[in-house]
Amino acid sequence: MYIQILGSAAGGGFPQWNCNCVNCAGFRDGSLRAQARTQSSIALSDDGVNWVLCNASPDIRAQLQGFAPMQPGRALRDTGISAIVLMDSQIDHTTGLLSLREGCPHQVWCTDMVHEDLSTGFPLFEMLKHWNGGLNWNRIELQGSFVIPACPNLRFTPFPLRSAAPPYSPHRFDPHPGDNIGLLVEDTRTGGKLFYAPGLGKVDEALAEKMRDADCLLVDGTMWDDDEMQRRGVGTRTGREMGHLAQNGPGGMLDVLEGFPEQRKVLIHINNTNPILDEDSPERAELVRRNVEVAFDGMSIEL
């Protein structure tokens, strides 16, 4: 299985366009050793030719341009994108569909809850019908597994995650299973397994069991501290309120990952305020000590 990190930041990217926090300002003036990052998205393939896009970032055009296999050049109009899987209906994971309209129709896989949000509060399915049929919905059931025909050797097993629906969702304050999902993806030829959960608010034993079954854990790296945005003076909500488990503190993501010594551990969906973006920070050094990696745009993983 080929895994390509197209974008590794949380909403707004890094540096965020309107932010002058320590990280963003430091990156711009050159005092911070860090890499720029676009908003979170990955691509999966079983042959390196046909790719499943997991989430469609607002930065999708730049991400595709930066990854040559996404333009195989087999025809006058072409793309390496064979299907799209949506983990949720958040703006930073779905807006890129608008930029892909010239390639419609697209095969889009998502849950009932995500489809409802994207047909009502943020009606992308309706909007894009005007472009060659738009988006063809393939339902993701929360039980069992599914296979996408373009990548027949990849088996996708979805699981619901505890997180928040977006503000435009009809059930914003009434969470439903399927508002947000993670994926266990297995290459049935190599046996390699990826656990992918960019929005992860809580890890219970059932979820931990799925993590133990994987070779690589690509998980929520949004915030270092739960009150990080408050500390940085750029927001009032905590990570938990937004559906993200912070890395630091008792029961945080680093404590969770300590329980998986055999797996490769990679943080993704990193907020612009997170000190781990600073490659010289003590927080980044702590990740190195714990053998936890930080995803970056252009990172490639094979399982």
From Swiss-Prot:
<dbReference type="InterPro" id="IPR001279">
    <property type="entry name" value="Metallo-B-lactamas"/>
</dbReference>
<keyword id="KW-0813">Transport</keyword>
<protein>
    <recommendedName>
        <fullName>Coenzyme PQQ synthesis protein B</fullName>
    </recommendedName>
</protein>
<comment type="pathway">
    <text>Cofactor biosynthesis; pyrroloquinoline quinone biosynthesis.</text>
</comment>
<dbReference type="InterPro" id="IPR036866">
    <property type="entry name" value="RibonucZ/Hydroxyglut_hydro"/>
</dbReference>
<keyword id="KW-0884">PQQ biosynthesis</keyword>
<dbReference type="Pfam" id="PF12706">
    <property type="entry name" value="Lactamase_B_2"/>
</dbReference>
<comment type="similarity">
    <text>Belongs to the PqqB family.</text>
</comment>
<comment type="function">
    <text>May be involved in the transport of PQQ or its precursor to the periplasm.</text>
</comment>
<dbReference type="InterPro" id="IPR011842">
    <property type="entry name" value="PQQ_synth_PqqB"/>
</dbReference>
<dbReference type="GO" id="GO:0018189">
    <property type="term" value="P:pyrroloquinoline quinone biosynthetic process"/>
</dbReference>
